[in-house]
């Protein structure tokens, strides 16, 4: 009867996909709709995942194919069964087995904590599925209750691992560096952006077991940063008071799986043979260990009950929007959004080509960005060979001639293991042992079909480590002084120059550093606007990439300080010098920086639309910034001679800001290759800055003399 009604419904709607009549919609995600289907001849109920390929960028398409390959390769009772793939114009339909029991998160939401015997039943099946993945050198990387499906809604249900969009093949002893998965079940080494191996899945298993027997996740937090802080600060795993009846073996397994240090965590073999899983009566783990085979084609005869996707997660098995959990039951503990880092250079990739008409090493757009092909893949615009020319030098009579900046070249970054979210090593930096680590490059996987704001909201919080930032009890003021403390003349809006110490290193005060980066970005943004107004869109785009790198550095600092827990945290900094950034505490600092970053991302995407060809030569942003600074200094001198002191002060201040950026901050940004200044260039920059500040002080002194303050 049910079969005839479904076929009749399909006939009325005209929806038939391959050999399957399409029934009601049972779920939807960011890129797909899931339908209940039934085989027209055999009556087998299936889940049909209809994916609109036009909505997937290249990397998501690769992730989809990766999922298909994994499911096609493995045939195991604890792995979701792949039945068929049916292609249609602009769409791919995945036919999967149908699980009428829903997922484990729905089960936990309905039942709360479960008896230990039930938890063991599910864990034995999860272990069996993981054994198959391990035998095939696969890390799932997104194990969570939402991705564990149940054949029925009872305590004897078969558990099946699903959603392999994040999974990847990992060679034995290999380490990955991508950020994937859901925060509440994510291993701390992943959240801290450290290399990780298959043991990351075991942390997730421990979190799932803990939630099964207690009804709650082992660690919580109002944000991913707070969650990580709680994990780091925890010295032991605490069980709720109402869980005193848990067996010693159960508690022991949870504790050993949830060890913060992966070296101390159980190995897979120790996990498989742990006493808690030693009872084979409820599940024959040995027989189930490895029942996988390679299928010769996409069609697999037979079916078994599978996924009830009443409420499918928004990422829908595709690794872009992470852990939105819009599908989860109301009140589900997985309620906040996952964040992700980004990769390589400072957002884009540009390969160096020899320029015919300029001593600069002009760059080409080697990776197709946004509008050029709308492939929206993970793009890298790399500045190769930052070299500033001798042209248009600012040469006051008292200053030495300017020479070109020198750079230290660097080869291309190694191929990433995962192109969606991967970290690759940044330029080598000498840092003290107390540092949080050297910087790592990042990428912006922009999407042509999704607003950048939505991407950043989900993926911008957890970033790579910044240049070393240590707490400071006082401001480490620049040898150039602070214009703010010198009654800077009106209009010098770029404010304080307390940016560097005697060794021209960035301030060790975290908030002072962020303020410096903010002002540098504002000054450089004027150059972008000016070139955009003059139709020099490629130049504007090149400079805009530097702004993205600046805001990425600010996000680095904010994130590192938030998770460090050291004395002199951002909250203390804000209370001490919290001007221009945030007045509401450290919890408001990161969102404000994120907002700025999002706006700059959108500007970059708009400018990228004007990149007409992959062979367009990318101008050197650092050279343009230097020349702009020198031109501002010259214009300021002209205005001073002409008696326009206020405008001269404005121009001098902007020039100083740009020069200080080149002398200090630019060397700390994630550029490929990194900008390296010789000692002679540093000296010349210092001389320029000193000369300009001398003129500013002269103007200030003249203004005080001309307009004495009333007593």
Swiss-Prot record:
InterPro entries per record: Atg1-like (IPR045269), Kinase-like_dom_sf (IPR011009), MIT_ATG1a/b/c (IPR056281), Prot_kinase_dom (IPR000719), Protein_kinase_ATP_BS (IPR017441), Ser/Thr_kinase_AS (IPR008271)
Residue sites binding ATP per the record: 26-34, 49
Subcellular location: Cytoplasmic vesicle, Autophagosome
Start and end residues of each Protein kinase domain: 20-277
One Pfam family from the record: MIT_ATG1
Record PROSITE patterns: PROTEIN_KINASE_ATP, PROTEIN_KINASE_DOM, PROTEIN_KINASE_ST
Motif residue range(s): AIM (Atg8-family-interacting motif): 421-424
GO terms under biological process: autophagy; protein transport; regulation of autophagy
Predominant place of localization: cytoplasm
Major enzyme class: transferase
CC annotations in GO: autophagosome; cytoplasmic vesicle
Start-end of Polar residues biased regions: 394-410
Region (Disordered) residue spans: 318-342, 383-419
Keywords: ATP-binding, Autophagy, Cytoplasmic vesicle, Kinase, Nucleotide-binding, Protein transport, Serine/threonine-protein kinase, Transferase, Transport
EC numbers, comma separated: 2.7.11.-
Active site: 142 (proton acceptor)
Gene3D superfamilies listed in its UniProt record: Transferase(Phosphotransferase) domain 1
Keyword Ion transport tagged: no
Family from the record: Belongs to the protein kinase superfamily. Ser/Thr protein kinase family.
PANTHER family per UniProt: SERINE/THREONINE-PROTEIN KINASE UNC-51-RELATED, SERINE_THREONINE-PROTEIN KINASE ATG1B
Function in brief: Serine/threonine protein kinase involved in autophagy. The ATG1-ATG13 protein kinase complex regulates downstream events required for autophagosome enclosure and/or vacuolar delivery.
Protein name: Serine/threonine-protein kinase ATG1b
